[in-house]
Amino acid sequence: MKALAKLKKQPGIWMINDAPIPEYGYNDVLIKIKKTAICGTDLHIYNWDKWSQNTIPVPMITGHEFAGEVVAKGDGVTSVDIGDRVSGEGHLVCGQCRNCRAGKRHLCRKTIGIGVNVQGAFAEYLVMPAVNVFKIPDSISDDIASTFDPMGNAIHTALSFNLTGEDVLITGAGPIGLMAVKIARFCGARRIVITDINEYRLQMARDFGATVALNVAPFKNQDELVKQMRKVMSDIGMTEGFDVGLEMSGINSAISMMLDVMNHGGKLSLLGISAGDISVDWGAILFKGLTLKGIYGREMFETWYLMTSMLQAGMDMNPIITHRLHIDEFQKGFEIMKSGQCGKVILDWSS
């Protein structure tokens, strides 16, 4: 089968045409891939950064955001049928630890990821345990379903706390941050402010309903950044701090600024992964009585039910997809992702 694989311990990704179709077991399904989306993680693997060098076995078929069709299944599978349109949870868990047995599978200590630790979805076929497979409702397109993984991250982060009637600050306007703007607006947030240094994506955020999309590139230090944020708050009628913070960047200055402008009793969801250690004002957390929640992946499968229900209720995520390419143009897709001048990039695996 055709697949995209990390074949060398250097930057790049390579097309192969003779990868074996994976074998499925008693409780597995075989999925024919229709669409995949390129994730920031895939870009890290492409660039072969320090995290990738320490994590990714080579050779490895990568990718974990997908939509496809069930074409075969093991004898023990009763939850899906051949012909079902599906996506799937890319975190594979042990099912036996305390958290798994308590229904908190997203907190499994033994989690491994498709396209990271085991064969991924950048291939014509993918094998996955049936318990990880999620049926796609007829009203949701394959393109949108292929973005369920990052959308689930955005849903989990944004809906960890109530957003209705609240003032929300989002730091980081990557695709997940942009999805969070859509989610917060759909859920009735009062004011939504988002920060980034990428003007293309900040304009997308404005189009998605952000009250203010602030380019923080011009500000030379933390004091200037906080001063400008307080001016923004004043300009939009905020007399107190933000009620909810959604941290999507992993950038020290963004987190420090967020802590500075949160209201007393504010709540923060932290999804962004830092490249190194982060220094925070512990006093701001204590004396403001802030609540912090770390986010990893999606709740299985509450997050999936929430996002499909919201999409079916009218939340429009289609504009997050800015580029659609055939799989043979995968190099162009990765170059577009590297440029940052995009939302989600979808790869079509049809013949």
Curated annotation (Swiss-Prot):
Enzyme class: oxidoreductase
Subcellular compartments: Cytoplasm
PROSITE patterns: ADH_ZINC (PS00059)
Subunit record text: Homotetramer.
Entry's Gene Ontology BP terms: L-threonine catabolic process to glycine
Active site: 41, 44
Keywords, comma-separated and alphabetical: Cytoplasm, Metal-binding, NAD, Oxidoreductase, Zinc
Keyword Metal-binding: yes
Free-text remark on how the cofactor is bound: Binds 2 Zn(2+) ions per subunit.
NCBIfam families recorded: PRK05396.1, tdh
Binding locations of NAD(+): 176, 196, 201, 271-273, 295-296
Transmembrane segments: none
Protein name per the record: L-threonine 3-dehydrogenase
PANTHER family xref list: L-THREONINE 3-DEHYDROGENASE (PTHR43401:SF2)
Enzyme Commission number(s) from the entry: 1.1.1.103
Cofactor(s) it depends on: Zn(2+)
Principal location: cytoplasm
Protein family according to the UniProt entry: Belongs to the zinc-containing alcohol dehydrogenase family.
Species of origin: Francisella tularensis subsp. holarctica (strain LVS)
